[in-house]
Amino acid sequence: MQNAPESVLNALVPMVVEQTAKGERSYDIYSRLLKERVIFLVGQVEEHMANLIVAQLLFLESENPDQEISLYINSPGGSVTAGMAIYDTMQFIKPNVSTVCIGQAASMGAFLLAGGAKGKRHCLPNSRVMIHQPLGGFQGQASDFAIHAQEILGIKNKLNNILAEHTGQPLEVIERDTDRDNFMSAAQAAEYGLVDSVFEQRG
């Protein structure tokens, strides 16, 4: 059963009515945009959201493996494992995935933004991008702390290496710049190599 805020939000999602040979058909706006190969990644990156994004990517690949997919991102970040599920699927499928930052792409959101197809990663002019090192929290026996600390360091190194590959920045620059929260404007993100261009308007 849906909780009250979720049901209210769902009720506010606009519906689009289309005329077909069989009569009228209505879609929620996100389903209609999915038909145009547009996916929205909005809010916290977590397991349920990642499963939905992965499913949409795989569906659109099955529909047409040669046509580009657009992923619009407005996210404060979230789970590394959920984000990596989306990232790996973006790299795995055949269609190019273009990424567009609307609003913000922070933490794992910025990582996914940079993971779009080369030449097809964009920011809208007033969006913000933030990169930093992965956050880790752990509760348990003292003997397990070292194990989890080592795991976090391994994840940090992996993410930094992937960011270096996508941005063209040297690894030592990525390590320095992700040591603390590092906020960038759209233009700064383009200069850094997280995106390829800033979209002012459709061409």
From Swiss-Prot:
Its EC number is 3.4.21.92. It catalyses: Hydrolysis of proteins to small peptides in the presence of ATP and magnesium. alpha-casein is the usual test substrate. In the absence of ATP, only oligopeptides shorter than five residues are hydrolyzed (such as succinyl-Leu-Tyr-|-NHMec, and Leu-Tyr-Leu-|-Tyr-Trp, in which cleavage of the -Tyr-|-Leu- and -Tyr-|-Trp bonds also occurs). Transmembrane segments: none annotated. The active site is at S107, H132. One of its GO terms (cellular component) is endopeptidase Clp complex. Keywords: Cytoplasm, Hydrolase, Protease, Serine protease. The keyword Membrane does not apply. One of its GO terms (molecular function) is ATPase binding. InterPro entries: ClpP, ClpP/crotonase-like_dom_sf, ClpP/TepA, ClpP_His_AS, ClpP_Ser_AS. NCBIfam families: clpP, PRK00277.1, PRK12553.1. Cleaves peptides in various proteins in a process that requires ATP hydrolysis. Has a chymotrypsin-like activity. Plays a major role in the degradation of misfolded proteins. Belongs to the peptidase S14 family. Fourteen ClpP subunits assemble into 2 heptameric rings which stack back to back to give a disk-like structure with a central cavity, resembling the structure of eukaryotic proteasomes. This is ATP-dependent Clp protease proteolytic subunit. The lineage of its organism: Bacteria, Pseudomonadati, Pseudomonadota, Gammaproteobacteria, Alteromonadales.
